[in-house]
Amino acid sequence: MLRALFQKTGNAVYISHLDLMRLFQRAFKRAGLPLTHTQGFNPRPSVSIALPLSLGVESQCELLDFELETDTFSNEDICTRLNQALVEGVHVLSVYAGGGKIKNLAYLDCAVLLEYDAGVPQNAAEQIEALFSREDVTVEKKGKKGVVEQNIIPMIRKFSATPVSGNVLKLEARVCCQNPSLNPMLLGAAVNQYLPDLAPDFIRYSRVEIYDTNETIFR
């Protein structure tokens, strides 16, 4: 089994998880890289993506696991061939063997850009940091069983808010990503819910890095 580290940026953030899977399957075929298939009545290509992204979220650290029918291709060749077959915004950074077990993924760093047409409100960073220093910030979360209320604070390891321009405030957080997991979009939802006067005109989300249970970069 091999693993690819790839980015998903630009307009590609609007490609759904299922469509991204299909995109990669087609890319392997166009690149002349034959994937193995699962056994059984409905064989499927041996390819999977860890920690599916929400629609509209950018990422610098996505992981794709796959298995080829042959070992005649070098990792560098696989990387080059895939990038030639993929769409703009989906870019493979490296291909390697011997990656960590996905079950050991525990945390991720995310960036949330709050954009204000009329400029970042005065003391916004201080008010938002005060919000996330509380013991309880409960927001609504959509799950398989419907909408539930969830206190997101126990799933936040680090948090900061910093103005990066006159119109943009950057939230940076390290959050749990498995068992339990916190969708970074809930950070923006919390600002809108608890600090409506600081609700931004637009929010951009990005996954920056992923870590194991020891908070070591995961690959």
Regions found by a protein language model. Give the residues of each.
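Extended, well-folded interaction surfaces typified by the phenylalanyl-tRNA synthetase beta subunit core
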Residues: L5-Q7, N11, I15, D19, ...
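Short beta-strand-to-loop capping motifs
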Residues: F6-K8, F66-T72, V112-A118, A173-N179
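Ordered, soluble secondary-structure elements with a strong preference for glycine-centered loop motifs
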Residues: Y14-L18, T72-D77, Q122, C177, ...
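Short, charge-patterned binding micro-sites
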Residues: T36-F66, G99-K101
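Ordered, amphipathic secondary-structure segments that act as subunit-interaction surfaces
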Residues: S59-L113
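Short amphipathic alpha-helices in soluble, non-transmembrane regions
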Residues: E76-L86, N123-F132, L187-G188
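Core RNA-modification/binding signature centered on pseudouridine synthases
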Residues: S133-R219
